Amino acid sequence: MKNNSVKIVVATGIGAALFVIIGWLINIPTPIPNTSIQLQYAVLALFSALFGPLAGFLIGFIGHALKDSFLYGAPWWTWVLGSGLIGLFLAFGVKRETLTQGIFGNKEIIRFNIVQFLANVVVWGIIAPIGDVLVYSEPANKVFTQGIVAGLVNALTIAVAGTLLLKLYAATRTKSGSLDKE
């Protein structure tokens, strides 16, 4: 258990740092204010798949809080929580044992993308906007529009870049029974 907790702490630190750096360097605006294409969610997908839901939550939560603090002066806590929840849910879209055995085929890709799409719809389309209305007294039509756009953009980003990262990672793993004795 101790070895696992050390891995989670290290993965959280590295993952959160990557979340901040990628979010800072690659921020593609959309027509909706304060909403952009965020490639760090693809990296969050990989880390969540490899290190589990706790690491995924912490990477998303800490990474988003730090990114907001550095870029905007203060975190927007309802969306910080949303990033943590996305990291948590992404871990349930991939069977870690299968991925580390080098298996990430069509069945795994479909499962991963169903889970990540549903997570994005629920987190960004429902939870974060309701939080914005309750915590920050934001206008509902504004935050639900932002949430829906963010959810769809993040789902597309994860579907393309996250799936690609997971597929590339699986390709680096040796499949059991793949070595033949000469």
Curated annotation (Swiss-Prot):
The chain crosses the membrane at residues 8-28, 42-62, 74-94, 114-134, 146-166. InterPro entries: ECF_substrate-spec-like, UPF0397. Keywords: Cell membrane, Membrane, Transmembrane, Transmembrane helix. It is found in: Cell membrane. One of its GO terms (cellular component) is plasma membrane. It is a multi-pass membrane protein. Pfam families: ECF-ribofla_trS. NCBIfam families: PRK13661.1. Belongs to the UPF0397 family. This is UPF0397 protein YdcD. It comes from Lactococcus lactis subsp. lactis (strain IL1403) (Streptococcus lactis).
